[in-house]
């Protein structure tokens, strides 16, 4: 598997759509590595710019540290050569450092630094957290701003100066002014990633703020649609983006919004619909009920044949 310096990884990620695969579980909720590796191989043929193993869509929050390393290692072994694998780090600082080092052992090419777990902190504390993780690894680090870890442009600018391997910023907040200020201040110093749930919804307006890529969960089960949507965004084809939003993305969001936590559950449901089941979600998430699954199946089947499977 090839290795790349941090800024080359960032450039690769900025050049195309990002794959966030689900993590496959058996009925007893143990990790189904053979099924997961088969899925990673299948996704690899569609040409994403990067693969984020065991991320939010991959139920990072329900995996043990040992499982995270196993999942990342499985992805690294299965992706086609040239496709960067990004591993997660999160929770408290000590755990995040441990996970970053585990990512290196597993052969990952970069780190997605998720928010600390269940704690509030000021900007100085958040900055210290990021510095510690960046100092612990030679891999490029992408900072995920969301929930209880929302970074100001001043903090990010200081971190970008202090941490050469801080190479990306993923936005999970949706504050246009904050993103405008960040991009105006840092420009091309970072790669900017759209990270709101069902990021396709916001992809076109975010493109004007320097956000050239985003995390696509639906790439798991409608990869050609996801890539065609991304291409329409990059072309700034407003009519095509609007059509695809109305035909699929927004109705999909309507199902997703029926219950909290469905941003992950609906992706595994989509896998089931296309005949590539990935097993249940782990608690505290819940799977779609039969009626919701039928709604999603009808939506997927209403789309023109795209050769997904």
Curated annotation (Swiss-Prot):
Its EC number is 4.2.1.41. Belongs to the DapA family. GO terms for molecular function: 4-hydroxy-tetrahydrodipicolinate synthase activity; 5-dehydro-4-deoxyglucarate dehydratase activity. Transmembrane segments: none annotated. It catalyses: 5-dehydro-4-deoxy-D-glucarate + H(+) = 2,5-dioxopentanoate + CO2 + H2O. The keyword Cell division does not apply. Signal peptide: none annotated. Pfam families: DHDPS. The keyword Transit peptide does not apply. This is Probable 5-dehydro-4-deoxyglucarate dehydratase. It comes from the Bacteria. One of its GO terms (biological process) is D-glucarate catabolic process. Keywords: Lyase. Pathway: Carbohydrate acid metabolism; D-glucarate degradation; 2,5-dioxopentanoate from D-glucarate: step 2/2. Gene3D superfamilies: Aldolase class I.
């Amino acid at each position: 598997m090839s290795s790349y310096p941090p800024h080359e990884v960032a450039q690769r990620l900025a050049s195309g759509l990002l794959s966030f695969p689900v993590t496959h579980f058996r009925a007893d909720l143990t990790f189904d590595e053979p099924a997961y590796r088969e899925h990673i191989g299948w996704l690899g043929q569609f040409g994403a710019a990067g693969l984020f193993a065991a991320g939010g869509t991959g139920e990072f929050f329900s995996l043990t540290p040992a499982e995270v390393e196993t999942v990342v290692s499985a992805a690294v072994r299965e992706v086609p050569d040239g496709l960067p694998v990004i591993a997660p780090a999160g929770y408290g600082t000590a755990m995040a450092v441990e996970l970053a080092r585990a990512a290196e052992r597993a052969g990952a090419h970069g780190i997605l630094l998720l928010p600390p777990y269940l704690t509030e902190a000021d900007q100085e504390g958040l900055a210290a957290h990021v510095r510690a993780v960046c100092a612990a690894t030679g891999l490029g680090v992408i900072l995920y701003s969301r929930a209880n870890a929302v970074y100001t442009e001043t903090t990010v600018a200081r971190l970008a100066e202090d941490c050469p391997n801080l190479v990306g910023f993923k936005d999970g907040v949706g504050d246009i002014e904050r993103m405008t200020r960040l991009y105006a201040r840092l420009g091309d110093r970072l790669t900017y990633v759209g990270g709101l749930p069902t990021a396709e919804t916001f992809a076109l307006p975010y493109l004007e703020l320097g956000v050239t890529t985003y995390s696509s969960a639906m790439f798991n089960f409608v990869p050609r649609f996801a890539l065609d949507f991304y291409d329409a965004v990059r072309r700034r084809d407003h009519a095509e983006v609007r059509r695809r939003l109305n035909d699929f993305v927004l109705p999909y969001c309507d199902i997703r919004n029926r219950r909290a936590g469905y941003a992950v559950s609906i992706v595994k449901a989509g896998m089931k619909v296309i005949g590539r089941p990935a097993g249940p979600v782990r608690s505290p998430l819940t799977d779609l009920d039969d009626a919701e699954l039928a709604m999603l199946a009808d939506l997927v089947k209403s789309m023109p044949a795209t050769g997904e499977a």
